[in-house]
Amino acid sequence: MKHKRFLFLLTAAVAFIIQLIDIISYTIKFSITKTFVLIIIQMIGLVGYAYDARNVVKNKRRMFTILQSVAFFIYLINLTYQLFLNPALRHVKVISSVNISPLKTILLYYTAYERHTLPIKNIILNMIGNVMLFMPFGFFVYVLFKPMRSFLPYFLFFLFMIVGVEVIQYIWKVGSADIDDIILNMSGVLILYIVLKIPFIKKLF
């Protein structure tokens, strides 16, 4: 059993180190798919360790808190990299722009779909990606920080954070400031909050 737990942790650690090399190195750059696979491997390693150790560790709550914190740390590194440091963003000549008209970009996607100027796959990935981007953040914040289980602190925290991300991306020229991104990002964390408040799910935390 100890060997199995060690293998789970080793797997997660190796995947994490490989990803750090990808982030730090100027020559080795993985595709989004490979990065996603590495993240999944890390999470499987942590979950596998927790599952295998569930009957051995006396203070299970503390163990899960530590594992959740580690998973949160891994997520934050990946999120920061993808939002601000990904070289792919630097290689693209971004036209800095600001959109403060709600649903303007979303309607542009719809128009592009109708005119067949943009594949539906790209549109769906972009829309769903924006909705899901901060959902893991919402989960970790809700679970690890009790004040965030109240709606107002949770809502205000993510509103200011997501607006801040848009502003920084605009200033650093790694994206445009778009209110539709804020709407989609906020929709994701609010949907997650509602799900976490479902009685039988709420009991788990």
Model regions: which residues?
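Bulky hydrophobic segments
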Residues: M1-K173, I179, Y193-F205
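Extended hydrophobic secondary-structure segments
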Residues: G175-I179, I183-S187
